[in-house]
């Protein structure tokens, strides 16, 4: 059962519209859909809230910058005594095109610095990941420049569509039906 949903991104207006903030876009949509206003909480190094689906679920958008996301996740997990297997981390994914969304259980960080830090801080990679496709840069554009740039209008629409697909499956996912959600999203 998922008790904490974390949306990854970078804080501040300079990053609001960048691909790397797909996790923030998800968490903000989820909070808004449930009438939840995320508030800054210094002890958790992020914006936090809670929604009630089948059970209360904590929401977190770390304000530590991507590479230090683990600080916020570990602080909240320790405070609420949430084991890694009850955490869902939502993040941008270079390996999938815009509009693609996938669930992954456990695993490595795949070069994603936010995931790398969360794994280091939790001492485990045993959390669920909701991977929102943003695609790869074309030509010789550096990956760092790509993820820190705004997507095209069509890519942003595709990413928004992926977020909506994921939100439509969320109750089922939170109830622990990971395989069924994988079957719905991985088509």
UniProtKB/Swiss-Prot annotation:
SUPFAM superfamilies registered for this protein in UniProt: Peptidyl-tRNA hydrolase-like
Any GO BP annotation: rescue of stalled ribosome
Q: Which UniProt keywords apply?
A: Cytoplasm, Hydrolase, RNA-binding, tRNA-binding
Q: Name one GO cellular component term.
A: cytoplasm
Q: Identify the stretch annotated as signal peptide in this record.
A: none
Question: Per the record, where is site Discriminates between blocked and unblocked aminoacyl-tRNA?
Answer: 10
The cross-references to PROSITE patterns, in alphabetical order and at most eight, read:
PEPT_TRNA_HYDROL_1, PEPT_TRNA_HYDROL_2
Q: Which reaction does it catalyse?
A: an N-acyl-L-alpha-aminoacyl-tRNA + H2O = an N-acyl-L-amino acid + a tRNA + H(+)
Q: Where in the cell is it found?
A: Cytoplasm
- NCBIfam families of this UniProt entry? pth
Q: Function, please?
A: Hydrolyzes ribosome-free peptidyl-tRNAs (with 1 or more amino acids incorporated), which drop off the ribosome during protein synthesis, or as a result of ribosome stalling. Catalyzes the release of premature peptidyl moieties from peptidyl-tRNA molecules trapped in stalled 50S ribosomal subunits, and thus maintains levels of free tRNAs and 50S ribosomes.
- Which HAMAP family is this protein grouped with? Pept_tRNA_hydro_bact (MF_00083)
Q: Specify the protein name.
A: Peptidyl-tRNA hydrolase
Native species of this protein?
A: Methylococcus capsulatus (strain ATCC 33009 / NCIMB 11132 / Bath)
What is this protein's gene name?
pth
């Amino acid at each position: 059962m998922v008790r904490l949903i974390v949306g990854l991104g970078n804080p501040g207006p300079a990053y609001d519209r960048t691909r790397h903030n797909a996790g923030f876009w998800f968490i903000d949509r989820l909070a808004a859909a449930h009438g939840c206003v995320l508030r800054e909480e210094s002890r958790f190094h992020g914006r936090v809230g809670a929604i009630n689906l089948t059970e209360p679920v904590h929401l977190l958008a770390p304000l530590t910058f991507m590479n230090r996301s683990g600080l916020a996740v570990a602080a909240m997990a320790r405070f609420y005594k949430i084991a890694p297997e009850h955490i869902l981390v939502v993040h941008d994914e270079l390996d999938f095109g815009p509009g693609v969304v996938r669930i992954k259980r456990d695993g490595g960080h795949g070069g994603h610095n936010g995931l790398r830090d969360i794994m280091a801080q939790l001492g485990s990679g045993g959390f669920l990941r909701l991977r929102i496709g943003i695609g790869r840069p074309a030509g010789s554009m550096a990956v760092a420049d790509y993820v820190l740039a705004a997507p095209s209008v069509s890519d942003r629409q595709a990413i928004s569509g992926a977020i909506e697909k994921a939100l439509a499956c969320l109750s089922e996912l939170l109830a622990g039906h990971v395989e069924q959600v994988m079957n719905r999203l991985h088509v």
